[in-house]
């Protein structure tokens, strides 16, 4: 089953290549969507794909790349919309 997830990652998640590594993980898992920095220092992403793949990407977000310190991940599950063909960084 395909799903959509909106995640907000809090902690030391900007300036540590979090977005770059999220793109790599999403491409490896076959997940589409986007990731972006938020003004307050958080990172937000929208992930779409097979439930198992999206869940794996969300699980990865709980620790992120080695230089990140993730304090909290806020997850909102939504119905799959099929909006994206690939995964990219939004600005």
From Swiss-Prot:
Q: Which residues form the active site?
A: 19, 37
Which SUPFAM superfamilies did the record assign? Answer: Acylphosphatase/BLUF domain-like
InterPro entries linked: Acylphosphatase, Acylphosphatase-like_dom, Acylphosphatase-like_dom_sf, Acylphosphatase_CS
The enzyme's main class, written as a single word, is hydrolase
Q: List the disulfide bonds in this chain.
A: none
| Keywords carried by this UniProt record | Hydrolase
- Provide the catalytic activity annotation: an acyl phosphate + H2O = a carboxylate + phosphate + H(+)
Q: What is its EC number?
A: 3.6.1.7
Q: Pfam families per the record?
A: Acylphosphatase
Which residue range or ranges hold the Acylphosphatase-like domain? 4-91
Q: Looking at the record's lineage, which domain of life comes first? A: Bacteria
Give this protein's Gene Ontology molecular function annotations: acylphosphatase activity
Which NCBIfam families does this UniProt record tie to the protein?
PRK14438.1
Q: Which PANTHER family is this protein grouped with?
A: ACYLPHOSPHATASE, ACYLPHOSPHATASE-RELATED
What family name appears in the similarity comment?
A: Belongs to the acylphosphatase family.
This chain's protein is named Acylphosphatase
**Species name:** Geobacter sulfurreducens (strain ATCC 51573 / DSM 12127 / PCA)
Lineage of this protein's species? Bacteria, Pseudomonadati, Thermodesulfobacteriota, Desulfuromonadia, Geobacterales
Q: Which gene encodes it?
A: acyP
């Amino acid at each position: 089953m395909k799903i959509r997830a909106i995640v907000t990652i809090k902690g030391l998640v900007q300036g540590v290549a979090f977005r770059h590594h999220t793109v790599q993980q999403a491409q490896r898992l076959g997940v589409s969507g986007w990731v972006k920095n938020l003004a307050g220092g958080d990172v937000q992403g929208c992930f779409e794909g097979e439930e198992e793949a999206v869940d794996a990407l969300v699980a990865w977000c709980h620790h992120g790349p080695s230089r990140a310190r993730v304090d909290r991940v806020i997850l909102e599950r939504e119905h799959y919309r099929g909006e994206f063909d690939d995964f990219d960084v939004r600005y």
